[in-house]
């Protein structure tokens, strides 16, 4: 009887092991497919989007000019979420970067105060439990005439600046990660905000 039980346990163990191996192979194949798709979409960006300083990057909802001294980081960028990095970036270390992305929200651009308070509440929830500074919130009008909300803070020693270029029930989210503390990064993100034009 003990021998039959041992056989059954061994068979179950082997079956689980085989299923795990098949599942792992399937996941790897899926990952490879995703990587190939991302590589193809990044190739498309090279041909139709601006990649260097002074060139225009087009989103579905609008466009912005890549700032002087910066370039498109083609490895991480997509048509919906481009990343720009300093031209001097060699591919190693923690790099300052700026991402640009469209998002939706339930607020009209005339109700910017409610939108501002909602963002502030969300940010405070996100940084709770981290070593973070107080959030400095402000607002201004971009050079193109759009209302912009700006939030500055540090999290775990890293300087973060977020801009929201508001429209009716949507916004362009410009996210500055400034690890070096360089003022150039701040100027670059401000340049993106000021050059952005809605379609």
Q: What do these predicted ranges mean?
A:
Residues 76-167, 171:
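Conserved polar/disulfide-associated segments of primarily extracytoplasmic proteins
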């Amino acid at each position: 009887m003990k021998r039959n039980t041992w056989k059954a346990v061994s068979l179950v163990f082997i079956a689980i092991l085989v299923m795990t191996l098949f599942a792992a192979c399937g996941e790897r194949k899926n990952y490879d497919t995703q990587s190939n798709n991302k590589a193809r979409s990044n190739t498309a960006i090279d041909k139709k989007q601006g990649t260097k300083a002074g060139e225009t990057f087009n989103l579905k909802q609008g466009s912005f000019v890549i700032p002087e001294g910066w370039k498109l980081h083609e490895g991480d960028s997509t048509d919906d979420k481009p990343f720009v990095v300093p031209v001097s970036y060699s591919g190693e270390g923690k790099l300052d970067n700026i991402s640009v992305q469209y998002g939706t929200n339930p607020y009209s651009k005339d109700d910017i105060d409610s939108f501002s308070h909602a963002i502030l509440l969300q940010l405070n929830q996100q940084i709770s439990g981290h070593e973070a500074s107080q959030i400095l919130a402000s607002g201004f009008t971009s050079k193109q005439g759009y209302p912009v909300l700006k939030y500055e803070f540090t999290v775990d020693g890293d300087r973060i600046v977020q801009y929201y270029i508001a429209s009716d029930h949507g916004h362009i989210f410009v996210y500055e990660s400034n690890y070096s503390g360089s003022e150039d990064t701040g100027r670059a993100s401000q340049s993106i905000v000021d050059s952005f034009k809605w379609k």
